[in-house]
Design a protein with these regions (language model features):
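Rossmann-like AdoMet
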Residues: 1-97, 101-144, 149, 154-156
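Short "lid" loop at the C-terminus of a central beta-strand within the Rossmann-like core
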Residues: 147, 173, 201-206
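A short, conserved alpha-helix within the catalytic core of class I
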Residues: 152, 174-186
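Short SAM/SAH-binding signature in class I
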Residues: 160-170
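Conserved beta-strand signature within the Rossmann-like core of class I S-adenosyl-L-methionine
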Residues: 165, 190-203
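Short, glycine-/aromatic-enriched active-site segment of Class I SAM-dependent methyltransferases
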Residues: 206-222
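Short alpha-helix
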Residues: 221-248
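Core SAM-dependent methyltransferase catalytic element
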Residues: 252, 256-287
Length: 287
């Protein structure tokens, strides 16, 4: 009863009430976007992030000087915003699905009046999200695990004849490889002609995630589990999956990285963190 009353009080005060440390990491992206927006030399602009963070009233001061995390986060946001805009501009009847969306407002940043953008995350996250970023007909919200298949089948039924892209930002490295494989296979089997956009770290970076300037603040509650070795390794998971392209972090915005720009001199580290595009073949090859 005490725990229930505490939860009710927190909800009444509008406090954040995520049920897992992994869900709470979505605050990092929100915080770094807000901090970046205040800079005169900003890489991205997201005033909504400032607004949400102020309303939440969460103390994020321990992350204030995490230069590498902030620069990496906003480069990643810029990449996926650009990909979303490209899809909306070039595709007929596009549906962009943001998996593990957290409190991100990509729809507000990228909407062109065309297509649909679906936001999906765990129910506790979506309950918080609804207070700040309510959905609409062209921006529906789904509270579910990304590993479930019911929402996939629901989208196919709701949007027949549409082409789907899935954006998985800042989430896969926290998961186990068998779960990621299952997710990618389920998407590949249902959405021919689609695209998968995600970021990944190398196996070495996954093993040493406590060296990450923000992850180490969470102690033992949060760490990376999955690292991607070769860029084409995922092609072996399902015959419909085809590597498209990769983009790296530390060869962009060189003036902002500080000493970390020296990582470009060490290829395994320079390419240790990347953002990828995988395509789903229109015609499924025989297995």
């Amino acid at each position: 009863m005490v725990d229930q009353n505490m939860d009710e009080n927190r909800e009444a005060q509008g406090e954040l009430d995520f049920r897992s440390p992994i869900s709470e990491t979505s605050l990092l992206t929100l915080y770094f976007k807000a901090q970046e927006t205040k800079r005169p030399d900003r890489i991205i602009e997201d005033p909504k992030a400032i607004e949400i963070l102020e309303k939440l009233g969460v103390d994020m001061s321990r992350f204030r000087n995490k230069r590498m995390s902030q620069v990496g986060t906003v480069i990643r946001v810029r990449r996926f915003d650009r990909q979303t805009r490209r899809i909306l501009a070039e595709w007929d009847r596009p549906v962009v699905v943001h998996l593990a969306c957290g409190l991100d407002d990509r729809f507000l940043r990228t909407d062109s009046g065309k297509g649909v953008q679906v936001d999906l995350d765990l129910p506790d996250v979506m309950a918080v999200r609804e207070r700040f970023l309510p959905g609409s007909e062209r921006n529906p919200q789904i509270g579910a695990s990304m590993f479930e298949t019911a929402w996939m089948d629901e989208l196919l039924e709701r949007y027949p004849g549409h082409r789907f892209a899935f954006i998985m930002e800042g989430v896969l490295m926290y998961l186990q490889e068998p779960d990621i494989q299952g997710l990618f296979r389920n998407l590949a089997q249902r959405f021919p002609g689609g695209e998968l956009h995600f970021d990944a770290v190398s196996p070495w970076m996954a093993r040493n995630s406590k060296m990450h300037d923000s992850i180490r603040e969470y102690g033992d509650d949060v760490r990376f589990h999955w690292g991607l070795g070769g860029l084409r390794d995922i092609e072996s998971w399902d015959p419909a999956l085809k590597f498209g392209e990769a983009e790296y972090y530390v060869n962009q915005e060189l003036r902002r990285w500080g000493w970390a720009v020296l990582l470009n001199l060490i290829p395994p580290l320079a390419k240790g963190a990347k953002m990828l595009l995988y395509r789903i073949r229109q015609e499924r090859p025989s297995e």
